[in-house]
Amino acid sequence: MNRKKLQKLTDTLTKNCKHFNKFEVNCLIKLFYDLVGGVERQGLVVGLDRNAFRNILHVTFGMTDDMIMDRVFRGFDKDNDGCVNVLEWIHGLSLFLRGSLEEKMKYCFEVFDLNGDGFISKEEMFHMLKNSLLKQPSEEDPDEGIKDLVEITLKKMDHDHDGKLSFADYELAVREETLLLEAFGPCLPDPKSQMEFEAQVFKDPNEFNDM
């Protein structure tokens, strides 16, 4: 991508980006095209497919849960075309790295609402907690322990006692205790990974100022 086209894309994306400045957007665009290994050609949209994106989540942000990584991919891939384009990349990372608590609550709830019906059901909690907990070899029936954990979680978070979590239940619980934001699995970067990523990507502002 030539310098003029890069600058135009940077300007366009910066206008619609809440949490990154122009320099940071420019750095993330460059990183995106490095990751996809090419530029946009006539009639062909370049993007990160599910496997490439999951690799970034695993290597860069230390995520290991396949189910959660798939859900994070869907959270970024807003048009559901099977790949994350440059616009989705910038918007997704804006929330992923620097989103407000409100933005992160909406995002995490969507990740945890596996079937998209607007609720986190007991079954969904069970699947996510089963994936995220280490199995103890001494346990005869590890599923029983997970079922108990689901009940404990519901008791703490299900404010209207209907046996499932609505967004209102979840929001209230998280505002009371922010540790519950990622109650069903890590779907945001930890502070160390976030700082390392930003330090690595957002460097050499002089190069940008020369544009």
From Swiss-Prot:
It is found in: Cytoplasm, Cytoskeleton, Cilium axoneme; Cell projection, Cilium; Cell projection, Cilium, Flagellum. InterPro entries: EF-hand-dom_pair, EF_Hand_1_Ca_BS, EF_hand_dom, Recoverin. Ca(2+) 2 binds at residues 113, 115, 117, 124. GO terms for molecular function: calcium ion binding. Ca(2+) 3 binds at residues 158, 160, 162, 164, 169. The keyword Cytoplasm applies. Residues 64-99, 100-135, 145-180 form the EF-hand domain. One of its GO terms (cellular component) is cytoskeleton. Strong expression in the respiratory epithelium. Expressed in the sperm. It comes from the Eukaryota. It holds the Pfam family EF-hand_7. CDD domains: EFh (cd00051). Component of the outer dynein arm-docking complex along with ODAD1, ODAD2, ODAD3 and ODAD4. PANTHER family: CALAXIN, CALCIUM BINDING PROTEINS. It is linked to Ciliary dyskinesia, primary, 53: A form of primary ciliary dyskinesia, a disorder characterized by abnormalities of motile cilia. Respiratory infections leading to chronic inflammation and bronchiectasis are recurrent, due to defects in the respiratory cilia. Some patients exhibit randomization of left-right body asymmetry and situs inversus. Primary ciliary dyskinesia associated with situs inversus is referred to as Kartagener syndrome. CILD53 is an autosomal recessive form characterized by randomization of the left-right body asymmetry and respiratory symptoms. This is Calaxin. It comes from Homo sapiens (Human).
